[in-house]
């Protein structure tokens, strides 16, 4: 918790939002809570023809005739603690990002910051960088303010608990689970009202993005349960629900708003996503037309993702294709992404104090490229970690016969993703067909074809495989086709 004198000193330079109804929603196993939402319902008091005067209503109460909402997106103010040129800053820059492996997290910042000073725990005064929106019932932003704040969270929820509250609002059921952790006795009604309204606003924001051409491909996240020795005992999957979408949409709104607020002509850190590979997309479309109902949407989604460009950090704004945004940045996770910390510092210079950036565009671009490289290395490490634990898991299932689908085709065989565990392994070309047969790789049609009898194995085909062997040191799984497969 922050010392009283630090709060007393900081509140003079910040917007005091400790009375705003505020909560966090995070994964159940999260240890740091670096973003929060606040919600208040405002009423239109009068209009003078030039603008509106807003009158704050009772905390969290239901609005009457003309609902107008104040929604705050509050991000832990890491830049207050991590100053440029310090050892902590240098180490964070070298890492570029936190790395999330199956059995551990390698944090970008020290634990004292992640899990204490910058963790927005309920009932504690915390320093934030915030984007505070005034929105109408159609999710239109009437005005916004980017500012440094002091907040005090009322509730800490995980995604399942938040979803329970949302569903209770939709079905009229009694709220079954709640985690006050410092919330007041009137918090239940306020929380239900806040989540109900925010969920409606988020759905409208999401619908607008999709209408503008945003990609909406969603994939379940593979998770492992480990025993006390770190051995996987279960593989399970987490699917995005309305609570995930709620948080996602308001984080996207904050990121986009900050990027637009900076304007053009000043060096800035954008998150950009170029157009996809047109030739690859045409191949995907042709494949879909040819296969018709024989190909699943999951396979088409997989190919569409593979055709996309990689999102990167850059001072050159080309927009974000996947989100259908003309301006976009990363502002909402400075505790785990160094570019967000750079953005917070630039916001302080440009918007809060009106000072110029101390770095040239070339220097800032070098930092962007470094952070993009760190991100890609971290993503590869995370993929490798998942593959390792898949191999450990499948090593306990040698000899089992299991159903799956072809998830990738190459000149040396094809990959199969098992239907239940979704572990992926290789059926090598030497284990396909009969001795003497020649298998040819048809790259455009994503298949292997036998030259002698034209039998083929195509991306997305259902197959039954036998777990042949696992190389844990190399994180590799080998399958062979089951007899009569």
What do the predicted segments below correspond to?
Residues 441-450:
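Short, structured beta-strand/loop micro-motifs enriched in basic residues and often containing a Trp
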């Amino acid at each position: 918790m922050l010392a009283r004198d630090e709060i007393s000193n900081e509140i003079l330079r910040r917007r005091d939002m400790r009375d705003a109804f505020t909560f966090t929603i995070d994964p159940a196993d999260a240890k740091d809570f670096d973003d929060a939402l606040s919600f208040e319902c405002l009423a239109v008091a009068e209009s003078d023809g030039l603008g509106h005067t807003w009158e704050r209503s009772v905390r969290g109460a239901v609005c009457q005739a003309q609902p107008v909402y104040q929604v705050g997106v509050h991000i832990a103010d890491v830049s207050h603690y991590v100053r440029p040129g310090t050892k902590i800053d240098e180490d964070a820059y070298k890492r570029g990002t936190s790395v999330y492996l199956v059995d551990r997290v390698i944090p970008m910042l020290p634990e004292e910051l992640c899990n204490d000073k910058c963790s927005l725990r309920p009932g504690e005064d915390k320093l934030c960088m915030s984007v505070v929106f005034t929105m109408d019932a159609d999710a239109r932003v009437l005005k916004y303010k980017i500012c440094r704040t002091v907040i005090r969270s009322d509730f800490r929820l995980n995604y399942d608990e938040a979803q329970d509250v949302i569903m209770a609002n939709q079905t009229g059921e009694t709220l079954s689970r709640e985690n006050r952790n410092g919330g007041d006795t009137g918090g239940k009604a306020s929380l239900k009202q806040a989540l109900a309204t925010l969920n409606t606003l988020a759905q409208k924001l999401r619908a607008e993005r999709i209408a503008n051409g945003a990609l909406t491909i969603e994939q379940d996240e593979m998770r492992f349960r480990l025993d006390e020795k770190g051995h996987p005992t279960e593989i399970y999957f987490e699917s995005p629900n309305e609570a995930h979408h709620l948080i996602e949409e308001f984080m996207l709104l904050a990121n986009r708003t900050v990027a637009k607020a900076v304007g053009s002509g000043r060096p800035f850190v954008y998150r950009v996503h170029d157009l996809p590979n047109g030739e690859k997309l045409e191949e995907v479309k042709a494949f879909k037309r040819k296969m018709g109902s024989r190909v699943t949407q999951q396979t088409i989604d997989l190919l569409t993702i593979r055709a996309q460009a990689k999102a990167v950090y850059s001072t050159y704004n080309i927009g974000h294709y996947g989100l259908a945004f003309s301006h976009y940045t990363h502002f909402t996770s400075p505790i785990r992404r160094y570019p967000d910390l750079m953005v917070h510092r630039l916001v302080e210079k440009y918007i809060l104090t009106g000072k110029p950036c101390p770095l040239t565009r070339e220097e800032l671009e070098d930092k962007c490229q470094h952070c993009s490289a760190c991100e890609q290395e971290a993503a590869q490490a995370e993929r490798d970690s998942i593959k390792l634990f898949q191999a450990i898991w499948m090593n306990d299932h040698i000899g089992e016969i299991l159903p799956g689908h072809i998830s990738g085709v190459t000149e040396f065989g094809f990959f199969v993703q098992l239907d239940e565990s979704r572990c992926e392994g290789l059926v090598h070309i030497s284990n396909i067909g009969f001795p003497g047969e020649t298998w040819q790789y048809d790259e455009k049609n994503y298949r292997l074809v036998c030259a002698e009898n034209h039998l083929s194995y195509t991306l997305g085909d259902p197959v039954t495989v036998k777990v042949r062997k696992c190389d844990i040191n190399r994180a590799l799984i080998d399958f062979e086709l089951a007899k009569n497969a």
